[in-house]
Amino acid sequence: MDVLYPRCAGLDVHKATVVACIRLALANGQAATEVRTFGTTTAGLLALAAWLAENGCTHVAMEATGVYWKPVWHILADDEVTLVLANAAHVKNVPGRKTDVSDALWLAELLAHGLVRPSFVPEPETQVLRALLRTRKQLGREKASHVQRLQKTLEDANIKLDAVVTNLLGVSGRAMLEGLVEGESDPGKLAKLAHPRLTATPERVQEALRGRVTRHHRFLLRLHLDQIDALDAAVARIDAEVNGNLASFHAAIGLLTSIPGVSKLAAQVIVAEIGIDMGRFPTAGHLLSWAGLCPRNDESAGKRRSQRLRKGASWLKTTLVQCAWAGSRKKAGYLQAQFHRLRGRRGPKKAICAVAASILTATYHMLKNGTSYQDLGPDHFKRRSKQAQAQRLLRRLADLGYAVEVTSVAAASA
C-alpha cells in the first residue's frame, strides 16, 4: 500500500497523558517508529509540539476523545503541521490487543497510508460561538427541569395551578406563585393576583389554589424560582456575549432566517455547528450525512438491513427538527407541502426528518452561493408529477368501473 505521508505521527490522548508515536518512512521501504509519553499540561504539550517539529512531522492524527483532544489540538494548531481528528469508531484496532502504545502506533500507520477520514473541526471563532450556544441550550434544559420540579412541588401541595394557567412562569402564574411563597393561603386573595385577561374564571382559579401548602413547600418553591431566575440571568449574559461574537456571521444569519421556521436563535445555532465555509463539505449530501439526516448504509447479501438515521451531530439535528416542525406549520409553503405529502405513507417522524433535511440542504446552497431562500411553493409536487398524478387518478377511476377519455383543457378549447 502506498505511503502518502512519510513523516507523520499518531497521538493517543488521555486526561493526564498523551502517548505519541512518530512514523518515519525509510529508503528501503520499511518504517522507523519512536514512542514517547507526554503530560497534558501546557508545558508537556509544548514539549510534544517541539518533538514533532524536531522530527519533521507533517501530519498528526488523534482520536476525538471527549474534550481531552481540544487542548492538544489548540497548541499543535499553532505549528506548521496538518492536524487530523479521527472518529474513534472509524479507527478501531484489533480487539484484544489494545494498549496506549498500540493505539498510537495504529493511528500513525493508518495516517501514513491515508486511511484516516478527518472529522469536521470548525474555525476558532466558530468554535467560540458553538461553545456559547451549546452552554445556552444546556441552561435551557436545566431551567425546564426546575419548572418540572416546581410543578411536582405544587402537585404535592395539591395546588392545580397548571390547570388554569398555560405558563407557570407567566404574569399570572408567577404572581400567584410569589403569593404562595410569601405565605398567602387564601384562594380568593391569591386569585386576585392573576392578570385580568386570564381566560380561566375566578371560581376555577380559586378552586385550583385550594390546597395544603406547608412551610417546606414554600421553601422548595422559593428555591426553584430562585434557580430559574439565576438561569434566566445566565442565558441573558450568554446572549450578550453571543451578540458580541457575531460580527462575521451577520450576513449568513440574515440569509438563514429567510427559511420558514428558522428563527434568529436557530440560525445562530446552525452557523455555530456547521460554520459558514461550505467548502469543507464537497456536496449537500456530505453535510446531510455528517448531520445524521440521511439513511445509513447497512447492506449485506444485497439486502438493506436498516435504514435508520445515524446519530450524527445531535446538537444540530435537534435544532433542525425544531425548525422543521415550525416550518411545517407555515401555510402555503413548500415545507408544509412536503411534510403532508410524506406523513400519510411514512409517518410524522420520518416526514419531519425529511423536512429537516430539506432545510439543511437549502442552508448548504444558500451559504455556498450567498443566495436567499426561494420557496418552491405549495404546489411544487403537483407541478413536478402532473402526468403521474393524472395516470394515478385514471387507474383509480378504472378500478371503480369507469372508462374515461382524457383531453387537455388547451386542446379542448382550440
Which residue ranges define each predicted feature?
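A detector of single, family-specific signature residues
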Residues: 1-414
